[in-house]
Amino acid sequence: MMREWVLVLSTLLWVPAGPTHLFQPSLVLDMAKILLDNYCFPENLMGMQAAIEQAMKSHEILGISDPQTLAQVLTAGVQSSLSDPRLFISYEPSTLEAPQQAPVLTNLTREELLAQIQRNIRHEVLEGNVGYLRVDDLPGQEVLSELGEFLVSHVWRQLMGTSSLVLDLRHCSGGHFSGIPYVISYLHPGNTVMHVDTVYDRPSNTTTEIWTLPEVLGERYSADKDVVVLTSGHTGGVAEDIAYILKQMRRAIVVGERTEGGALDLQKLRIGQSNFFLTVPVSRSLGPLGGGGQTWEGSGVLPCVGTPAEQALEKALAILTLRRALPGVVLRLQEALQDYYTLVDRVPGLLHHLASMDYSAVVSEEDLVTKLNAGLQAVSEDPRLLVRATGPRDSSSRPETGPNESPAATPEVPTEEDARRALVDSVFQVSVLPGNVGYLRFDRFADAAVLETLGPYVLKQVWEPLQDTEHLIMDLRHNPGGPSSAMPLVLSYFQGPEAGPVRLFTTYDRRTNITQEHFSHRELLGQRYGNQRGVYLLTSHRTATAAEEFAFLMQSLGWATLVGEITAGSLLHTCTVPLLDSPQGGLALTVPVLTFIDNHGEAWLGGGVVPDAIVLAEEALERAQEVLDFHRSLGALVEGTGRLLEAHYARPEIAQRARALLQSKLAQGAYRTAVDLESLASQLTADLQEVSEDHRLLVFHSPGELVAEEVPLPPPAVPSPEELSYLIEALFKTDVLPGQLGYLRFDAMAELETVKAIGPQLVQLVWQRLVDTAALIVDLRYNPGSYSSAVPLLCSYFFEAEPRQHLYSVFDRATSRVTEIWTLPLVAGQRYGSHKDLYILMSHTSGSAAEAFAHTMQDLQRATVIGEPTAGGALSVGIYQVGNSPLYASMPTQMALSASTGEAWDLAGVEPDITVPMSEALSTAQDIVVLRAKVPTVLQTAGKLVADNYASPELGAKMAAKLSGLQSRYARVTSEGALAEMLGADLQILSGDPHLKTAHIPEDAKDRIPGIVPMQIPSPEVFEDLIKFSFHTNVLEDNIGYLRFDMFGDCELLTQVSELLVEHIWKKIVHTDALIIDMRFNLGGPTSSISALCSYFFDEAPPILLDKIYNRPNDSVSELWTHTQLTGERYGSKKSVAILTSGVTAGAAEEFTYIMKRLGRALVIGEVTSGGCQPPQTYHVDDTHLYITIPTARSVGAEDGSSWEGVGVTPNVVVSSELALTRAKEILQQALRG
């Protein structure tokens, strides 16, 4: 910034010296001081002062002789440097004093104020009950407070009853910003206050927030009424801020010109003692409604509707007229939808959407049309439902052409026979094309009554010449349609050989609320053409109404193939409902009243009909003849495909179903839509895959000649030894990874004879490097398969020579035999064996033979498969030509069956043991190798931890011994999580102890390791609150105390807060006559505080032996005795105590309950406790993320050797936990009452 100022000021200070020096350089310093003290964008002035001082050191003197020129130069420099056109420097030699701002209105008398207000504020009520308020200068807060009642009674009340308001600010260029909240508040609802602006004043360096007023004199203008603000290029300052705020609030529509982009407060200040003055904006709007960005200052307020200022009022009144009509338009639209719209199920959604739409931005009929259509289309998805603008005479209420009416007047049928024959000849063009192909063109659909009258003539002149043709082309390219009443009659002529009437289509008419099924006519003049011969309809973009209905139905019924252009998409079955009438025009709704539903249950929404073969209209006839030639062979192609399936597909029962489906669809005309071999292949493939659920079934078109798969290929040329070495190195990638981990990648499966031929070289160059590794990774991620004949040989290397292993079985369709595939007794080179780990990497691109190898090894539990699921390939694929055509069918000819289950697996593909993205498969395999190498030491460590620490030494030693013998069970473990589950399950089976647990806790979850992370001790203040919430006390009826806590704490910790416990807990219950201790929800915790708690319920002397605890890690027995010294009073041994238990009472809570019951100090009431254990210890297993939680201590205080661990504490009074408290109160009350 400083560099920019140096350049600017150097420009200002340096010009060629003139004869007269107007001022000293201090003028620039004075100007800079005014900017620094008054300019409302001080952040833009950073570095200016230093730049001026630097420029002054150059001793360059500004020497312009003309002061006006100097003022212009200074203005241009300041405006360009600050990018602010509001900064202006003027030369005014006649001004002796600094110019004052406009006279302050508060210095005027009341009469003068009223006169001033009446000049600046004018109002009236315009035609249509539109309020008009013109403000040319906005008074400030003091004046509005002084004259508020006058303005309300003489101005505002006259406007309150209007239906809308025009606020005219076109001539307002001044005012005080303190008046802004008054204007905004009268137009803002009074239920909330709103922050509308923040004004920064530079001279005082203060920021003032502008909020709407919570209360105003008089009434506020209703929020339901429209407000329009008029602006012009002269609208400035405070008026701009008002227009901007109302626009951002969406409370007003701004109409007119962009405002001048001035400032809230401009001041003209003298520069030093010179005759130069600087006009500078001293205040600025921070505009919270604009999101904190740049507001209107400098750029102006852009109107919602731009128009010249002198036309703004007229435009505003037109907008208000439209907006007054909006509720009526929406209401009529909703009524029209309810009364006429044929898709009744969509009406509620449309009504709701219309009611919830925001119309605040609608300022023209075009806006309204766009908004309504967007809403209607979004909900209905019906292109026929449309709002449109109408001309002055185009908005009368009338339905469009109905379903039984013609868009043009139907010509009268002549009575003379010659005239009728001539009429038929003029409407129909009939000819027979080469190849015995009938051609029929007619350019208009007639009413059913007309056809009935002209029937004999049409039959004789049109229909009979076409009866013996093999195919029929009907030309509708020039047919704009007509009435559709004759549709069932016309369609009936194309019905098949069925005896009874056939349902053609269904219609629903909203006006009559009738759903009607339309059937073919039983009796017809003349013969039917039927649907066994090919019928081809030619269409164009001019084909409309009844003509496109006919095309749609013929295509839907499968009776015709359409060729040409997409039709017009204009239907007859709509109604026009006027929504708005005005002298200039109006709005109308086009609403569909009738819906066509074809035999598939699909409703036609009136879009253009899409032909099966899309070509230009002028090319349609030629293309139809090409399609016709193709269809002559259609039956043979479909039948041929079905026969190939039955003969070669690997799943015979599916092949029969597939062929039956093809025959059925052919008979129904489903393949008439196929217009070439490509589209037929696509349809056949979709049908075959749908019925078989086999993605490997394909029909495709190949113009070139394919080599039949049954023909043996010529033997490949035998490569030289050098070439063979090069090929092997290129095709096979090997490596020995750290840890003696072999890696083998090959991306193709060769044929068995080829593998045998190059066997010695493969063994020498590839296999010998890998056979002695500790484990092997076979990477098939990039192997699409190919020949499967070498799979048994590959598998054999990973099993022993004897006994031979059944790998899988193959069902061959050609022989209809199942062949079992076994490992080979002899292989070249050394076997890898059956004991070393094998890992196979797969991806979604791995196919056929690669899948066979992976699935076989996985099925026999010989390998761990890692990667992505495969798609499911085929061991053998046959490609067969359909007849002599360039159409081919590709299908699996063999089916792979699992050796273990006998089920076919090849279609489903291979599901990995561990599913990861293919990019992570190798690293995952390496991690598993490392993990499996750790398993023996992990089991050894786990056994030692159990033997050394389990609370029962004998059982711990037995578990350790048995665990080492289970190592083979872990041979296929794939993750530490799985290892933790298996180890935990084995330990619990061996011990019968559910508290002996194993967990896998990753590095990022160490806070969940029990017993590892110490609990943070809170401050005494926090602890005081914690105690109050953790302990629940009460004194019940008959002075029975109640104490509940749900966890035991550490003794050392509780000692630190013992005084808090006594003060806030114990003192409340110590003087009761009996006590209930609620342990029903206590989950245990440290046992170190149990002796202290028990001591409160015994006398000071003599000491009582509470229990003996055996600790396995140090192989010692510790005794728990009552304490002789306690904080606070003892409860003593005489008063009754009851302890409540439940099935969740555990750990330390059970130890406490057990001691109190065994010593006869408490009556236990409730349910048998959970049978937990003394607090266990958690141990980390080697360098893994495995942790073993081991019960290390047990109670041995009972003379009979009994304990509560694992079996729980049996209450003296067994009741459900929900009734325990009630039962305890009853027993204690009975004891107290004696």
UniProtKB/Swiss-Prot annotation:
One of its GO terms (cellular component) is interphotoreceptor matrix. Expressed in the photosensitive tissues; retina and pineal gland. Residues 18-1228 are annotated as: 4 X approximate tandem repeats. It is found in: Secreted, Extracellular space, Extracellular matrix, Interphotoreceptor matrix. SMART domains: TSPc. GO terms for biological process: proteolysis. Sequence repeats lie at residues 18-320, 321-628, 629-929, 930-1228. Glycans are attached at residues 107, 205, 513. The keyword Signal applies. Its main location: secreted. InterPro entries: ClpP/crotonase-like_dom_sf, Tail-specific_protease. Residues 1-17 form the signal peptide. Residues 383-417 are annotated as: Disordered. Disulfide bonds: none annotated. CDD domains: Peptidase_S41_IRBP (cd07563). It comes from the Eukaryota. Belongs to the peptidase S41A family. This is Retinol-binding protein 3.
